[in-house]
Amino acid sequence: MSIAEDVTQLVGNTPLVRLRRVTEGALADVVAKLESFNPANSVKDRIGVAMIDTAEEAGLIKPDTVILEPTSGNTGIALAMVCAARGYHCVLTMPETMSIERRMLLRAYGAELILTPGADGMSGAIAKAEELAKSDKRYFIPQQFENPANPAIHAATTAEEVWRDTDGKVDIFVSGIGTGGTITGVARIIKERRPATQFVAVEPAASPVLSGGQKGPHPIQGIGAGFVPSVLVLDLVDEIVTVGNEEALDLARRLAKEEGLLVGISAGAAVCAALHVARRPENTGKLIVVVLPDFGERYLSTMLFADLAN
C-alpha cells in the first residue's frame, strides 16, 4: 500500500508544465515547476518540513516547544501545517501588508499571528520574533533566512526533481529570491553535474537590493525581503533580473487566463524574467525551468485580482 503517515510526507515531487500561450517572442522552451502542488500549496512546504525535521533530530524541539517564525506568509503557512500535523503550537510574526488570505490560512491551521508594521518589511517581522524569543525560553525560531536546512532540502529534493524531469537537460533555471534557498540548493547540485547551466535570480525593480540598489516597498509578496539573506550564495547566481510591479501583476493574470495556471504575484515576476531571458538570440532552443512558488487563490483580495471583486 502507498499511504502517507501524515501530510508532511506528501511534500515534493511537483510537476513541470510547458508554457505555450504567454511565450510570444520566446526563442527558448520555457517550462514551469508548479510548487502549488504541495499540500499547503507553496514551495515553502519543503523548508517547513525540513526545518522542523532537522530541529527534531537535533533535540531542539520538545513537546512544550513553541515554534516561532518571521514570515511573509508561505513559510508560516507551511510551518503551521507541520505544527498542526505534529502537535506543536505555532506563533508567527508577519508584515501587516500581507494578504488577508494568508492571515486566514495561518489561523485556519491553528497558528497565532502577530502583525508588524508594513513599512518595516521582513526586517520588522524578524526583529519582533527575536524580541519574543528573548522573553520565553520555550520559543524555537527555525529562521528560514539563516537555516542551512533551507537550501539543503532544495538540494536534496527540488534539484533532483528538476534533473530527473528534464533528463538532465536544463539549460537555465529561474527563481525569485525570498530567502534564496531554492536557487542556492538547486544550483549546488546541478552546477556540479552540468556546469554550463545558468541560474537567474529574480527580484523586484522597486527593491533591487541584490543588484546593489536600495530596498523599497513593493507588492510582490514572497520575494524582495530588503536584505541579502545569509542562506543565499550569490556566487552560484549567474544573473539577477529585476521585474517591475505592473509587469509581475500582468504576467500573473495572464498565466491564469491564458495558461490555466492560477498563481501568485511572485510567479508572475519569475515568468516575466524567464521570458526576458528566453527572447535572447543566444538562448534559442534552450530549456528554461522557472519556479512558480504558490497558488493564486491566496491573492484574491489583493491588487492582483482587484478588478474581479464586482
Curated annotation (Swiss-Prot):
Signal peptide: none annotated. It is an enzyme of class 2 (transferase). It holds the Pfam family PALP. The modification N6-(pyridoxal phosphate)lysine is found at residue 44. GO terms for biological process: cysteine biosynthetic process from serine. It catalyses: O-acetyl-L-serine + hydrogen sulfide = L-cysteine + acetate. Catalyzes the conversion of O-acetylserine (OAS) to cysteine through the elimination of acetate and addition of hydrogen sulfide. This is O-acetylserine sulfhydrylase. It comes from Mycobacterium leprae (strain TN). The lineage of its organism: Bacteria, Bacillati, Actinomycetota, Actinomycetes, Mycobacteriales. The gene is cysK.
